């Protein structure tokens, strides 16, 4: 048997979420996966395209995240966009659910990684950015980049 991995190994980052949402709180959750999904994740074959977290019967599920089928899975493959259960404490689930219902926030996946050999997802309680907020972010990023370029020249 192979030695256990230590530390974190990043699988994928949801860059679009950072652009579309303002993150208020972040949580780490475990993922309930099938074997072929774990193997596919290790190859980095995941897309967050329209991913979000839905609360149902006191549990949290990640919806709309595409994990590509593992080629060597044979008959034991998985459905690419099935809802995946998140492993969180009940208090965390209830706190997020209340904020989503009352304040009109949403919960989105931010990144997927392996921590000590186990698949984890970082989810964030987020508020959607308005178009002008996104423009302001782009402007400030451009100004920072220009300033750094000028400093490097001199």
Swiss-Prot record:
Major place of residence: cytoplasm
A molecular-function term among this protein's GO annotations: RNA binding
Compartments where located: Cytoplasm
Pfam families: SmpB
GO terms for biological process, alphabetical: trans-translation
Superkingdom of origin organism: Bacteria
GO annotation, cellular component aspect: cytosol
Entry keyword set: Cytoplasm, RNA-binding
Protein family according to the UniProt entry: Belongs to the SmpB family.
Primary role: Required for rescue of stalled ribosomes mediated by trans-translation. Binds to transfer-messenger RNA (tmRNA), required for stable association of tmRNA with ribosomes. tmRNA and SmpB together mimic tRNA shape, replacing the anticodon stem-loop with SmpB. tmRNA is encoded by the ssrA gene; the 2 termini fold to resemble tRNA(Ala) and it encodes a 'tag peptide', a short internal open reading frame. During trans-translation Ala-aminoacylated tmRNA acts like a tRNA, entering the A-site of stalled ribosomes, displacing the stalled mRNA.
Protein name (Swiss-Prot/TrEMBL): SsrA-binding protein
Lineage: Bacteria, Pseudomonadati, Thermodesulfobacteriota, Desulfovibrionia, Desulfovibrionales
Gene: smpB
